[in-house]
A protein has these predicted regions:
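Short, small-residue-enriched loops and turns at beta-alpha junctions
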Residues: 64-67, 94-98, 125-127, 146
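Substrate-binding N-lobe of the ribokinase-like
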Residues: 1-43
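Conserved phosphate/ATP/ADP-binding segment of small-molecule kinases
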Residues: 104-167
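Conserved phosphate-binding/catalytic loop of the ribokinase/pfkB sugar-kinase fold
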Residues: 49-84
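Small-residue (G/A/S/T)-rich helix-start motifs and N-terminal tracts that mark the onset
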Residues: 20, 29-35, 67-76, 80, ...
């Protein structure tokens, strides 16, 4: 999206194995700026299947483990990159061995550097990350229901759910 809008951007994070290599090659072929931390484990894949009647099935592999050295390298790179950007977008679930507050740490670093942190994640990671007050979150209907415990079946219940969690 940033590329299409002619905005400056850089994709970063963790990539490893054949899938990571494939993704980096595709990004390069499509002239998408990137600078990833190489990890020892294989990057996971996520496959979404939509049937003609609109039902969706998601096949989601478990994510790779990230070791302390890889995490430290990323945090160093992230902190350096903060001097070149105004907005950070973090998206997706965390690798299973990173702490639930990892996005919170990234939010704190962004805030310290007067940058806006936008977050698209779900579940306990989202719940934990809210404690750090990211500038923007992008929960979908299911994620709002999970976060608030309120079943959303109309615009009114949607508003009620949001107001109950974010008065």
């Amino acid at each position: 999206i940033c590329k299409e809008l002619n905005e400056n951007y850089l994709a970063t994070g963790f990539l490893g194995g054949k899938i990571g290599e494939y993704l980096q090659n595709k990004l390069t072929q499509n002239h998408i700026n990137h600078d990833f931390i190489s990890i020892k484990n294989e990057t996971r894949t996520c496959i979404n299947i939509t049937t003609p009647d609109g039902k969706q099935t998601e096949i989601l592999e478990p994510g790779p483990s990230i070791n302390k050295e890889e995490t430290d390298l990323f945090l160093k790179k992230y902190t350096q990159l903060l001097t070149y950007t105004d907005i950070i977008v973090a998206s997706g679930s965390l690798p299973n061995n990173l702490p639930l507050n990892f996005y919170g740490t990234l939010t704190q670093l962004a805030t310290k550097h007067h940058k806006k942190f936008l977050l698209d994640t779900s579940g306990q990671t989202l719940k934990e990350s809210l404690k750090y007050k990211p500038f923007f979150i992008k929960p979908n209907k299911d994620e709002i229901e999970q976060l608030t415990g309120i079943k959303i079946d109309s615009l009114d219940t949607f508003k009620d759910a949001l107001q109950s969690r974010f008065p």
